[in-house]
C-alpha cells in the first residue's frame, strides 16, 4: 500500500503509472505510520472509484446476544467486559468499531490479531465475541451458520443477507456507512484528457457483466 503510493507519487505524470488501491494508504497511513512521505490530497490525481466493500459487525453463533441492540445493552451494563477482534491496529476492522463505540458510548476492548483468519477462528470458537471484517470475508461463515451479522456498513441492506440491518439503522445515523473503497489514482499533474480516457476505459471494464456478477456474488 504505502510503498506503491510512494512510488506513484514520485513517478512521471505521463499516464503510464497508475495505482489501484484501497483507502488505507490515503485515509489511514499518513496519520498512523511514521515515514509516510506523500501528501494524500496533493500528490495524486484521482481517476475513478470502482468499488466499495462494506464491513459487517458479526458475533459467534453461540453468542449471548442476538442483535446489535442486545450487544450494546450488555456492553453498557458491563463496561470494559466485552472485547472485540480486529485484524490489527489501524485496519478497518479496528477503526470502524471505534467509531461505533464513540457513537454508542460503549466501553469494549480491542484485541488485535495478525490476520483475518485467526480472528475469525477465535470468533467462531467463542474466544472473542465481536469482529468487524469485510462482508466478503464473513459471508461464507454467515452462510454456514457459524457467525451472525449484527450490522452491515453498506448504505442499503445486502441483497444476499437482507435481515442484517445497516450501521446507519442501528445507530440512528442516516447516511452513515462503514466501507472500504477501491479506486485508481495517478501521479499529480496527469493531463485532464488522459484522466478522462482512463476513467472511461476503467469504468467500462468495471461495468462489464462479468465484473458486476463477481461483485454481486460477494455482496
Where are these regions (language model features)?
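Conserved helix-loop-beta element of the AMP-binding
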Residues: 45, 71, 146-158
